Amino acid sequence: MMQPSIKPADEHSAGDIIARIGSLTRMLRDSLRELGLDQAIAEAAEAIPDARDRLYYVVQMTAQAAERALNSVEASQPHQDQMEKSAKALTQRWDDWFADPIDLADARELVTDTRKFLADVPAHTSFTNAQLLEIMMAQDFQDLTGQVIKRMMDVIQEIERQLLMVLLENIPEQESRPKRENQSLLNGPQVDTSKAGVVASQDQVDDLLDSLGF
């Protein structure tokens, strides 16, 4: 027994589909022009390469700061290790002397070594302080990168706002797709789709896109 042939859900020919896509594209372009959004979208598109360059700048500045900090730590480590080793050795020698006092000649040598250690400490600490200052100065990139990131966030928000305005103005309510069955969105904020630019939070953006089937 032959199985009945299954007709495709969309009976439009390829030519009809292409014609409809072309018509929708023309309608979208005309609507953008009428709303004055074409220039805004163009500016947003031009901002994308600029944002990419800014991201690269942030990466460079962060990498340079990390390298400066690591170099300072590596330079300071031998000085700290030397002071620690010398201090432990002198402490052990003094403990031994107090437990069993040695001859005056040996005691004089211990005192001389201790004085030498104390005389060397300022040089080690001065070098370490200079490296700590270098680490602190390396963090100045945060001011610059913070400004760059803020600018990028503004660009992204503007692109999102313009795209939402296009959706709101060009998708009739009766043609919007059914909402996805997602209970977490049923109690979300209500959005007045009769006005452009009224979306106030990311949750509202998600709800709006969900209601449109995107």
From Swiss-Prot:
It comes from the Bacteria. GO terms for molecular function: phosphoprotein phosphatase activity. It is found in: Cytoplasm. Residues 174-199 are annotated as: Disordered. The record marks Q147 as: Enhances dephosphorylation of CheY-P. InterPro entries: Chemotax_Pase_CheZ (IPR007439), CheZ_family_phosphatases (IPR050992). Keywords: Chemotaxis, Cytoplasm, Flagellar rotation, Hydrolase, Protein phosphatase. The keyword Cytoplasm applies. One of its GO terms (cellular component) is cytoplasm. Its EC number is 3.1.3.-. Pfam families: CheZ (PF04344). Residues 183-193 have a biased composition (Polar residues). GO terms for biological process: archaeal or bacterial-type flagellum-dependent cell motility; chemotaxis; regulation of chemotaxis. SUPFAM superfamilies: Chemotaxis phosphatase CheZ (SSF75708). It is an enzyme of class 3 (hydrolase). Homodimer. Plays an important role in bacterial chemotaxis signal transduction pathway by accelerating the dephosphorylation of phosphorylated CheY (CheY-P). Belongs to the CheZ family. This is Protein phosphatase CheZ. The gene is cheZ.
